[in-house]
């Protein structure tokens, strides 16, 4: 991995206040983003921008991955669900933060992206990540309940199934909206859901039974 490039990007995110937690900094520094991109896009891997990965999908900008990890308040040992694997990059970053005692289940609906991301995650040794082919808007009941759930595509609302599969005290992070989207954080406390608007964002549409 071109260390000087990722050091520059992460240093910039720290100086702008996007990322603060050492665990997030360490994870972003250690995951080789270029490995999750098509060969013809590898040279752009450490530009802090979303990039196309095929099938009409994108890999999120590095700052957005960092912000989401910060806002999820990730810690070692947590059980995490990712809705929308895409390239697999964000699942890899999250897996570094939750560590070997934690687990990341990531669900992708597009077979081509599922196969590619599963292969890369396996080759790079992310053993605490389980890749699943399916409709992420239904969650993934088999590995629930989850301490943290995050969605990497924007839907009209957060699917009910995700709240049902969330532990009490757990957090869901999801972009909501169509043309104008807001990154929302939901916390379940004593069975009640409390929501908070974080920032305006731009994600691909959430497709599925409980999406668009």
Swiss-Prot record:
InterPro entries for this protein: PCMT, SAM-dependent_MTases_sf
Top enzyme category: transferase
GO molecular function: protein-L-isoaspartate (D-aspartate) O-methyltransferase activity
Chemical reaction(s) catalysed: [protein]-L-isoaspartate + S-adenosyl-L-methionine = [protein]-L-isoaspartate alpha-methyl ester + S-adenosyl-L-homocysteine
Residues annotated as catalytic: 60
Key word Transferase present: yes
Main location: cytoplasm
PROSITE patterns, alphabetized: PCMT
Function: Catalyzes the methyl esterification of L-isoaspartyl residues in peptides and proteins that result from spontaneous decomposition of normal L-aspartyl and L-asparaginyl residues. It plays a role in the repair and/or degradation of damaged proteins.
Family of the protein in this entry: Belongs to the methyltransferase superfamily. L-isoaspartyl/D-aspartyl protein methyltransferase family.
Name of this chain's protein: Protein-L-isoaspartate O-methyltransferase
Lineage of the organism: Archaea, Methanobacteriati, Methanobacteriota, Methanomada group, Methanococci
Gene symbol of the encoding locus: pcm
């Amino acid at each position: 991995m071109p260390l000087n490039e990722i050091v520059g990007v992460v240093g910039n995110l720290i100086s702008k206040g996007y990322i603060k937690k050492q665990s997030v900094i360490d994870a972003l520094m250690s995951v080789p983003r270029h490995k999750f991109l098509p060969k013809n896009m590898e040279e752009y891997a450490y530009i802090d921008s979303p990039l196309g990965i095929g099938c009409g999908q994108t890999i999120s900008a590095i700052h957005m991955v960092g912000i989401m990890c910060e806002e999820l308040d990730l810690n070692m040992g947590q059980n995490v669900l990712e809705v929308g694997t895409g390239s697999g990059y964000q699942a890899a970053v999250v897996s570094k933060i939750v560590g070997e005692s934690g687990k990341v289940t990531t669900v992708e609906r597009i077979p081509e992206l599922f196969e590619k991301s599963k292969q890369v995650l396996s080759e790079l040794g992310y053993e605490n990540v389980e890749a699943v082919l399916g409709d992420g808007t239904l969650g993934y009941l088999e590995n629930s309940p989850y301490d943290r759930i995050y969605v990497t595509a924007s839907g009209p609302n957060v699917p009910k199934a995700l709240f049902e599969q969330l532990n009490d005290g757990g957090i869901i992070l999801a972009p909501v909206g169509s043309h104008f989207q807001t990154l929302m954080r939901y916390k379940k406390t004593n069975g009640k859901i409390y929501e908070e608007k974080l920032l305006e964002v731009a994600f691909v549409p959430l497709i599925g039974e409980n999406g668009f």
